[in-house]
């Protein structure tokens, strides 16, 4: 029986890549800088002391970081027994965004350039805005700028509630984000607006990767909170991913937990399970692992590392999240059967000590564990697509165009 379980710790980079200079990210190191802050006692909010990740360390995380950067992260045990196979992987794709990272993991790197809205003020073309106002019958719009999602709610949330004007904003990523109040504006109405925006961006040739619905609740600045009803409308991958091949060629099953289905525009996904927060995502993953049959992938994205702690530059929160993940990891490992493989990885970096609020161009960890997986180093991987090629070989699908099987 062939089953693979892929866990993406969204944004969990392990050191800047060779091309980081192109992105302004030389020296970025999500894991290394979190560990350093913990070791110095600078991340003692809601947790305390050196970064404590014994289970990830046993799977080779510290060694993978050493391969990427040349050193073991502060406070982590470089001499611990390693029971898994580990690697550090470079991104072939042109960007450092979520779709690029995930698609490349599934064997389809993004070799074209995404479109971006690079102006920090008046970010969107007037023609696009006019079409959205007309088609969605809007009273206007707010924002039209680059912003952090939580900051813009404090700035414009109250005005949005009074006027009914949606908040449009973007970032350094290829995204068009729309924030609206779940109750005063309405969740269905927000989703409909995002569908219209997706159509207009596609028809207009803007080449924007995602439209993201950002619903929130609350009644005044300071207590607005984004909810778990985020929805991403992505373009489809430019070629069949290993997920699609498993479904088409092997009549397999691919279970999305969290936002995976959105990232792949539902391509190659046979079941979607929604969950919000680390514990809920873990619980849903465990349930699906227990029910998984032959030729099945259970694919989970743990988004909180990125959205709650990476972008918000919350070192202590990120550290606490990693420690929670590590504590629960044995629950996943104990469910593995003889031929199963568990892959822990990431899609990009988002160093919470870095300037700004954007992603960072970093190597990702590739930690592979299973009863029949030989422990030890799998070395430096030139593309995340090595994961996809490894899965293609494992399940016996046709080869992916990119990547080399790791074993």
From Swiss-Prot:
Query: Per the entry, which co-factors are needed?
Result: Mn(2+)
Q: Which gene encodes it?
A: deoB
Give the pathway.
Carbohydrate degradation; 2-deoxy-D-ribose 1-phosphate degradation; D-glyceraldehyde 3-phosphate and acetaldehyde from 2-deoxy-alpha-D-ribose 1-phosphate: step 1/2
Where along this sequence does the record place binding of Mn(2+) 1? 10, 347-348
The UniProt family comment states: Belongs to the phosphopentomutase family.
Q: EC number(s)?
A: 5.4.2.7
Q: What class of enzyme is it?
A: isomerase
The organism encoding this protein is Escherichia coli O1:K1 / APEC
- Cited function: Isomerase that catalyzes the conversion of deoxy-ribose 1-phosphate (dRib-1-P) and ribose 1-phosphate (Rib-1-P) to deoxy-ribose 5-phosphate (dRib-5-P) and ribose 5-phosphate (Rib-5-P), respectively.
Q: Where does Mn(2+) 2 bind?
A: 306, 311, 359
Q: What is the lineage of its organism?
A: Bacteria, Pseudomonadati, Pseudomonadota, Gammaproteobacteria, Enterobacterales
Question: One GO BP annotation here?
Answer: nucleotide metabolic process
Q: What is this protein called?
A: Phosphopentomutase
From the Swiss-Prot or TrEMBL record, state where the protein is found: Cytoplasm
Keyword Metal-binding present in the record's keywords: the answer is yes
């Amino acid at each position: 029986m062939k089953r693979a379980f892929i866990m993406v710790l969204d944004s969990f980079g392990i050191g800047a890549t060779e091309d980081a200079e192109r992105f302004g990210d030389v020296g970025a190191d999500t894991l290394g800088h979190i560990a350093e802050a913990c070791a110095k006692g600078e991340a003692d909010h809601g947790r305390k002391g050196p970064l404590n990740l014994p289970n990830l360390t046993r799977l080779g995380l510290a060694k993978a970081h050493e391969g990427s950067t040349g050193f073991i992260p502060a406070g982590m045990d470089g001499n611990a027994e390693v029971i898994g196979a580990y690697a550090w992987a470079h991104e072939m794709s042109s960007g450092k965004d979520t779709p690029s990272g995930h698609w490349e993991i599934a064997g389809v790197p993004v070799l074209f350039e995404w479109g971006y809205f690079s102006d920090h003020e008046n970010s969107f073309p007037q023609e696009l805005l006019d079409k959205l106002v007309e088609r969605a019958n809007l009273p206007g719009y707010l924002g039209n700028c680059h912003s952090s999602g939580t900051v813009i709610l404090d700035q414009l949330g109250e005005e949005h509630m009074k006027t009914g004007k949606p908040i449009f904003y973007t970032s350094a990523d290829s995204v068009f984000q729309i924030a609206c109040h779940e109750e005063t504006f309405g969740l269905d109405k927000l989703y409909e607006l995002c569908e219209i925006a997706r159509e207009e961006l596609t028809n207009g040739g803007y080449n924007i990767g995602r439209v993201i619905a950002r619903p929130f609740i609350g009644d005044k600045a300071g207590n607005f909170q984004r909810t778990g009803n985020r929805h991403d409308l992505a373009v489809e991958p430019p070629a069949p991913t290993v997920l699609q091949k498993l479904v088409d060629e092997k009549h397999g099953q691919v279970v999305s937990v969290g936002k995976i289905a959105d990232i792949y525009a539902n391509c190659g996904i046979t079941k979607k399970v929604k969950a919000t927060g680390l514990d809920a995502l873990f619980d849903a993953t465990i349930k699906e692992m227990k029910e998984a049959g032959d030729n099945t992938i259970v694919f989970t994205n743990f988004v909180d590392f990125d959205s709650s702690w990476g972008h918000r530059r919350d070192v202590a929160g990120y550290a606490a999240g990693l420690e929670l993940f590590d504590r629960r990891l044995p629950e996943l490992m104990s469910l593995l059967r003889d031929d199963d493989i568990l892959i822990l990885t990431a899609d990009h970096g988002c160093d919470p000590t870095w300037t700004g609020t954007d992603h960072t161009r970093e190597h990702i960890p590739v930690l592979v564990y299973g009863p029949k997986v030989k422990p030890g180093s799998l070395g430096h991987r030139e593309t995340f697509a090595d994961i996809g090629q490894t899965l293609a070989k494992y399940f016996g699908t046709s080869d992916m165009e990119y990547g080399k099987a790791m074993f």
